């Protein structure tokens, strides 16, 4: 059939039918219904039979076109996940080109996913256009249809299979468009694209969920009620056939394809996800299971998994009503028992408010007949009491979902398992469980105490547990608290023995009525002997307000030493059980206390523990506080304080009286271990009262409270001195000289003698302090060789002396100075000397009034003009003054070596004079003048001996200037030298040397001057070392004439040595 015939023109050859078979030549075929036509008659032979097939051919064509349009609409709906109306025509749907454009995008994405490498080399690209112009554009549908045609080309369709955009937009040839879409489907399947088959595609029947659930429920009900597993019953087969008739549709040959998955799922014997029970389908599931009982339940009880009798599953499950609950709650609760030998309760046997009556009647009607042997497995025998009395009512307010998972409510020991996971009891099933256990008591409860899990006598567990009332508690609290004792040899408390405010009286009466008969040997194991007193008196009520969950875990309340176990975890003391523990320890003292001190755990005598511990009152504290504070001393040879010996404001008096009444008899040897000897003084005097307000948790961690040095502990952390305790520490050292601990001071450290630690520390009151304060402060002196006197002692001695220095020593000493060329020496002389003030008898007087006269410039050598070196000599007016010693500067200079401006050690801080050297900076002002003429050159060498005056360029010279400025002068000067100084100050700054080579050549001439400067420093250090009084030195009259003569001699000497 030609294209012209398909478009409605006259057929040139109608011998090809719609199904592709060629018609016989002798049969006359008429044109199709689209008219047109002509008729071609074949050559007729004799006896030929003419058959007219015009009616059958037209009928087939009509059916063919209707099928194509129907399948096209279904195929487009399946690809695009759309649903079209029954009356919608394909021509109208495709006219705007939007559907074809959407199909092109879907196919393009599939092609990119499967054939990305091949499409990269293709020149045809399909992209989604953001806008096609105006929504009512005339040519917008043509552009969309063109995108679909490009996809057809990529898939490999030939030109004869394609259509033109006008066939769709103008609805000229809708049949050819449908045939093209069919070809696209076939090509896509060949390329393994996930598209439906055009020929077999059908509508996807949508059914409500309740209809599907009802069908499957009926199928499962029939199989559930069948006694054999041979397969479907005739009734079930009839129902399946009925469903196939209803939902089969016209294509019966595809029924197996549509319902394969349903039949496979219907063969499952278990419950599907849609069979979950909720409030809506509760009645339906209940009736379903009531009608289909499990007839094989008789053997179900023999497997040891609990016998439910003829009760249905609905009664054992009921309606699960979950309001606001965390998803992890059901996952974390250990409701399912996973032991192989015994599974009393299955997961569906959980008890709640709804199935309370059902479970009650179940257990009353069908008790476990093997309960007599239950006790033989070692799973706890509570006597004739019921489980409800041994558990009580668990009242939980706001609790994290991980609480039940983390709480160690289940005892996992093999020999003794009092409670199974399925035995959880709450307020709702209290009566049911009570009646259950009352009807089936355990008769072998007498042997329960022999298993070593604690013997409660005939008392029930509820008296030892009571009601657990938890307010707002972190989920990790129960997990982290060490409530369970896991030692093999001794397990005094089981998890159910926790004591609180509610069951205090019950536990008290329980332990009073049934004391542990083996308590006499309990003390021998080294775990503290409580005598005949009950556990309630030693534990009391644990009252926790708002506390972090890690507090109980991190606090080192348990002593882990092998030789000494003074307190077990249950021995914690607080404000509530203060009186109980006091009476307990007073009435039943530890008889082995004499040997207790010998183990190195501290000897408290006959005093009770409460006096050494007191009441621990914690308000709002960080959880890491107890963990980070190193309160436990871990040395083997000396353990002065145990964890229970912590002292605060509350137990201050108790600890004071305890240690005063019961001193440590081994204190004489205690000092010999190298841990500090405090004599016979009490602990309170050596510690004092520690008052901490709001403090960071890292404070105790960062502060070095534990001294770990073996041989030498000069200053403990408590000896740190700051502005607050300066007076106290000063008086301590002044009032407490070392009298009897001679060997202690010989190591080069301070000696505290018989003074207590409290006198050297005092009361440490900390308000709001940063945790890094104690860590960053460096209060400990770590030098071994330096142990000088105090600042007052150093400044209380005065040494007037005269020293001479030979020229050889001056030359050797001056060789350390380094010159730098090209520097203007006038800059040093420009420093103002009018601001200098002399200190005399505590009063400051300006020295400016003593400076008079004019200056004079020394004549330079003729050959030094090219170098530009100018040496100026200044004269100072006659004056006399004394310099008072500053205690702080002298003390600081004793401990710290001299440093340059950049932190480099100065050349003058050698061993010969490194101890006491003042480092007071005067900014280049007039310095001290000694009695020796050589020392007086310091004022002139400011402009002559150093050619690098800028402290940024020459830190060494700057250091020397700083040290020179620390000495003031009181000596008169000669009048003839005043003119020289004034002339030097009046010299312009622009007159600078032109070269630095002359400076290097005149070094020899300045060696004498340099030696004089260094000798002056050396002599100053010697004077400071031998001073005895409060004044550093006395001023003496110095003549500067000798200085000028020495300078001239040095110049002449340099001229002789020059080539």
Curated annotation (Swiss-Prot):
This is Protein OPAQUE10. Cereal endosperm protein required for the ring-shaped distribution of 22 kDa alpha- and 16 kDa gamma-zeins in protein bodies. The chain crosses the membrane at residues 1003-1023. Residues 515-534, 858-869, 984-994 have a biased composition (Basic and acidic residues). Homodimer. Interacts (via N-terminus) with FL1 (via C-terminus), HIP, 19 kDa alpha-zein (AC P06677), 22 kDa alpha-zein (AC O48966), 16 kDa gamma-zein (AC P08031) and 50 kDa gamma-zein (AC C0P381). Residues 269-786 are annotated as: 7 X approximate repeats. GO terms for molecular function: actin filament binding. The seven repeat domain is responsible for dimerization. Its main location: endoplasmic reticulum. Keywords: Endoplasmic reticulum, Membrane, Repeat, Transmembrane, Transmembrane helix. It comes from Zea mays (Maize). Expressed in kernels. Sequence repeats lie at residues 269-342, 343-416, 417-490, 491-564, 565-638, 639-712, 713-786.
């Amino acid at each position: 059939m030609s294209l012209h015939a398909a478009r409605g023109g006259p057929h040139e050859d109608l011998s090809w039918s719609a199904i592709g078979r060629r018609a016989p030549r002798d049969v006359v075929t008429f044109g199709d219904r689209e008219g047109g036509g002509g008729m071609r008659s074949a050559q007729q032979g004799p006896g030929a039979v003419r058959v007219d097939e015009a009616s059958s051919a037209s009928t087939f064509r009509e059916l063919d076109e209707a099928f194509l349009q129907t399948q096209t609409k279904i195929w487009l709906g399946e690809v695009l996940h759309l649903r079209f109306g029954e009356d919608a025509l394909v021509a109208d749907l495709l006219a705007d080109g939007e559907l074809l454009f959407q199909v092109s995008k879907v196919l393009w994405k599939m092609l990119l996913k499967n054939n990305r490498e091949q499409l990269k080399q293709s020149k045809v690209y399909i992209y989604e256009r953001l806008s096609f112009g105006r929504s009512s554009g005339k040519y917008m549908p043509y552009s969309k249809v063109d995108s679909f045609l490009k996809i057809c080309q990529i898939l490999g369709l030939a030109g004869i299979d394609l259509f033109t955009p006008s066939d769709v937009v103008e609805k000229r040839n809708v049949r050819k468009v449908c045939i093209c879409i069919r070809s696209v489907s076939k090509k896509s399947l060949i390329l393994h694209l996930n598209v439906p088959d055009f020929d077999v595609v059908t509508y996807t029947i949508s059914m409500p969920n309740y209809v599907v659930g009802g069908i499957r429920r009926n199928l499962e009900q029939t199989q559930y009620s069948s006694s054999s597993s041979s397969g479907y019953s005739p009734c079930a087969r009839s129902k399946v056939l009925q469903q196939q008739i209803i939902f089969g549709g016209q294509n019966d040959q595809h029924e197996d394809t549509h319902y394969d998955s349903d039949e496979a799922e219907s063969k499952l014997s278990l419950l599907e996800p849609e069979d979950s029970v909720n409030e809506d389908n509760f009645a339906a599931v209940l009736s379903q299971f009531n009608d289909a009982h499990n007839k094989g339940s008789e053997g179900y009880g023999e497997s040891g998994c609990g016998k439910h009798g003829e009760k249905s599953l609905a009664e054992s499950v009921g309606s699960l009503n979950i309001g606001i609950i965390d998803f992890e709650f059901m996952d974390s609760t250990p409701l399912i028992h996973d032991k192989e030998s015994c599974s009393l309760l299955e997961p569906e046997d959980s008890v709640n408010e709804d199935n309370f009556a059902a479970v009650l009647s179940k257990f009353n009607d069908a008790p476990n007949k093997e309960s007599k042997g239950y006790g033989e497995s070692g799973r706890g025998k509570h006597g004739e009491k019921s489980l409800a009395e041994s558990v009580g009512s668990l009242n939980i307010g706001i609790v994290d979902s991980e609480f039940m998972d983390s709480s160690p409510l289940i005892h996992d020991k093999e020999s003794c398992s009092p409670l199974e996971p399925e035995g959880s009891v709450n307020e709702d099933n209290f009566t049911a469980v009570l009646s259950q256990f009352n009807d089936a008591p355990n008769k072998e409860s007498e042997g329960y105490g022999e298993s070593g899990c604690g013997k409660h006598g005939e008392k029930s567990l509820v008296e030892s547990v009571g009601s657990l009332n938890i307010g707002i508690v972190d989920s990790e609290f129960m997990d982290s608290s060490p409530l369970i004792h896991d030692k093999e040899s001794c397990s005094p408390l089981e998890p159910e023995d926790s004591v609180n405010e509610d069951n205090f009286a019950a536990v008290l009466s329980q332990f009073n009525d049934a004391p542990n008969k083996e308590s006499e040997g309990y003390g021998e194991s080294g775990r503290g002997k409580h005598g005949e007193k009950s556990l309630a008196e030693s534990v009391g009520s644990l009252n926790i307000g708002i506390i972090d969950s890690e507090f109980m875990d991190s606090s080192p309340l348990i002593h882990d030493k092998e030789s000494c176990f003074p307190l077990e975890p249950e021995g914690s003391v607080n404000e509530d059980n203060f009186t109980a523990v006091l009476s307990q320890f007073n009435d039943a003292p530890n008889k082995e206390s004499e040997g207790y001190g010998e183990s190195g755990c501290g000897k408290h005598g006959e005093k009770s523990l409460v006096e050494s511990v007191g009441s621990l009152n914690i308000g709002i504290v960080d959880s890491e506080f107890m963990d980070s504070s190193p309160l436990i001393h871990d040395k083997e040879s000396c353990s002065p304080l145990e964890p229970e010996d912590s002292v605060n404001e509350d137990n201050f008096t108790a600890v004071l009286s305890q240690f005063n009444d019961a001193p440590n008899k081994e204190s004489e040897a205690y000092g010999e271990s190298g841990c500090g000897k405090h004599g016979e003084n009490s602990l309170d005097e050596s510690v004092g009262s520690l008052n901490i307000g709001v403090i960071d948790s890292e404070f105790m961690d960062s502060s070095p409270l534990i001294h770990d040095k073996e041989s030498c502990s000069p200053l403990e952390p408590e000896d740190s001195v700051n502005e607050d305790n300066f007076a106290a520490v000063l008086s301590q050292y002044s009032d407490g000289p070392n009298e009897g601990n001679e060997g202690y001071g010989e190591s080069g450290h301070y000696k505290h003698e018989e003074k207590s630690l409290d006198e050297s520390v005092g009361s440490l009151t900390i308000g709001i302090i940063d945790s890094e304060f104690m860590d960053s402060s460096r209060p400990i002196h770590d030098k071994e060789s330096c142990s000088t006197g105090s600042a007052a002692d150093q400044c209380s001695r005065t040494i007037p002396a005269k020293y001479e220095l030979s020229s050889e020593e001056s030359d050797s000493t001056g060789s350390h100075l380094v010159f730098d060329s090209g520097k203007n020496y006038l800059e040093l002389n420009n420093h103002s000397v009018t601001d200098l003030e002399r200190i005399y008898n505590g009063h400051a007087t300006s020295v400016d009034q003593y400076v008079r006269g004019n200056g004079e410039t020394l004549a330079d050598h003729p050959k030094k003009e090219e170098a530009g070196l100018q040496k100026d000599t200044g004269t100072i007016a006659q004056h006399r003054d004394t310099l008072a010693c500053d205690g702080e500067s002298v003390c600081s200079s004793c401990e710290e070596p001299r440093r340059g401006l950049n932190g480099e050690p100065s050349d003058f801080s050698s061993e010969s004079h490194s101890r006491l050297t003042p480092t007071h900076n005067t900014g280049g002002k007039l310095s001290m003048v000694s009695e020796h003429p050589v020392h007086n050159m310091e004022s002139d060498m400011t402009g002559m001996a150093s050619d690098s005056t800028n402290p940024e360029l020459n830190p060494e010279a700057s250091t020397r200037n700083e040290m020179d400025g620390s000495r003031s002068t009181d000596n008169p000067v000669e009048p003839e030298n005043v003119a020289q100084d004034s002339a030097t100050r009046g010299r312009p700054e622009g007159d600078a040397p032109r070269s630095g080579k002359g400076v290097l050549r005149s070094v020899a001439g300045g060696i004498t001057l340099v030696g004089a400067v260094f000798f002056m420093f050396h002599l100053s250090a010697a004077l400071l070392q031998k001073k005895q009084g409060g004044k550093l030195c006395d001023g003496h009259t110095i003549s500067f004439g000798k200085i000028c003569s020495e300078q001239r001699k040095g110049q002449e000497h340099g001229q002789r040595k020059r080539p």
